[in-house]
Amino acid sequence: MFSVYTNDRIADAETDAISDPEKAAFVQRYEHLLEPIADVAYGLAVMIAIAGGPLALFLTFFPGVFWIFYASGWLDAFDGSLSRLKAVLVLNTTVVALAWAIVLTFLPVAFAGASLSPVVLFVFAYFFLRVFTFVELSNIPDTEGDRQIGVSTIPTVFGIRGTRHALYLLNGLTGAIVLGALQSGLTPLPVAGVLLLGTGYSLGVAALVGRWANISVLIQAAEGEYVLTYLALLATMLVV
């Protein structure tokens, strides 16, 4: 993911200069270092994946393939009317969330040699919704730049208030699938409690969208959900 996102930032450095000039300037200044580092990182990931077998190797290539369709203009070489998936409302975030959720869920399954199960599908749905939520929150600072380059996101189309309500909905859906998994016995109560705690934290961050002036701080706070959830899960495993 580091490799894919680094290459994405390099490819979009010019357009990112509109919404985040400091980040774009950093990427352009150190592109000669970032690009080979990203390539080496992907190469290492492929080498590690070989040990996990064909499925793990396939899943490792997944993010790179998704990036080609998501961020590059590669498809335009075949049909000039085709837009980058990155420019299509909801579909752009769906592609990112799918790429993350597929790798985070199924790569460990491939290494463990486990089979597909309802628990795995629950984990996939959970990761998909969490990534989708974070990506749309992260799109808020890019609103002006995205509008200028024709990229449609929830913030550009529905505004801050609409985005806040969308984040409420996404967090609500996450809570619903966690409760559903708990009720059906797919996850024990302590784990469900931790996941709901993280979702509640995210809901609190969403409530501040449009009401807290520094959106960068909110995004950093949203990233804290993963740390909070991980530490709480670790503590739960040590205690229970």
Regions found by a protein language model. Name each.
Residues 1-240:
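Multi-pass alpha-helical membrane architecture of UbiA-family
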